[in-house]
């Protein structure tokens, strides 16, 4: 099997063969692909701001923000623009180059709250930062409004495979998620879409999710790999921890099948040691989320702080990546 070329015709069996490689060989192959398409010394450090917290009507089994579960999350109204701008300014001073604004909504609605989000996007973009939003489902017209405001990326995760999906979520279909990604693709906004490990899914489910992403043309420019943090009060509170080598395998496989994408070591990173994170970077992860206040990433997962991350990057000889110019999606025929 050849690696290191962009293709959109991956079969599930091929991806499973990649995932099942002997671990050190898999890491080596992924590292080789990573060096071919990316600067291996650079890691993008991102900051997530929960601009509207809790009270979500959906039933995602892993999420502390669902109104259906009794968790410690206290609903919080949409933040004011000045607060968001101040958080982003502080993050930029720490070396952050990408800010992700998350709202616990099922879908975007054309109302005054969306208008306020558009203003936030414009002001933070004007600071020279990449801005990503995760606001739920949206239409093409709404995506175009976000594009006009300067949005760099829109996040809409698949979470898991299409077969396992209904076990985790019943209030939104897999097709709904793919349709939102397609709506974003009608603009120049880049796509961020990945999944979560530890939902009770099988290896086949993980591989199937990657196959769905890797057969999108173009590939998502950003592929977050999240690790479940069990939240008391949610249906998945008793799920076992994900073995770190499963995380490394998933990152390496994503890197090989989607060579140009940023693979983001996202939620759940706080429980990984520096050594374990180093293996993730070797396997092709080139982005992390960091914070200055140890508040919750997406309100469910502790986020490492800037100082600890800077120390780790220095130790590993890595540097923070500056903001990117908006890339043009890589669209090619199957090869």
Curated annotation (Swiss-Prot):
Keywords tagged on the record: 2Fe-2S, 4Fe-4S, Biotin biosynthesis, Iron, Iron-sulfur, Metal-binding, S-adenosyl-L-methionine, Transferase
Gene Ontology molecular function terms on file: 2 iron, 2 sulfur cluster binding; 4 iron, 4 sulfur cluster binding; biotin synthase activity; iron ion binding
Ranges where the Radical SAM core domain occurs: 41-269
Reactions listed under catalytic activity: (4R,5S)-dethiobiotin + (sulfur carrier)-SH + 2 reduced [2Fe-2S]-[ferredoxin] + 2 S-adenosyl-L-methionine = (sulfur carrier)-H + biotin + 2 5'-deoxyadenosine + 2 L-methionine + 2 oxidized [2Fe-2S]-[ferredoxin]
GO BP, one annotated term: biotin biosynthetic process
Cystine connections: none
Pfam families with a match to the protein in the record: BATS (PF06968), Radical_SAM (PF04055)
Stated role: Catalyzes the conversion of dethiobiotin (DTB) to biotin by the insertion of a sulfur atom into dethiobiotin via a radical-based mechanism.
Quaternary state and interactors: Homodimer.
Protein name: Biotin synthase
Originating species: Trichormus variabilis (strain ATCC 29413 / PCC 7937)
Taxonomic lineage of the native organism: Bacteria, Bacillati, Cyanobacteriota, Cyanophyceae, Nostocales
Gene responsible for this protein: bioB
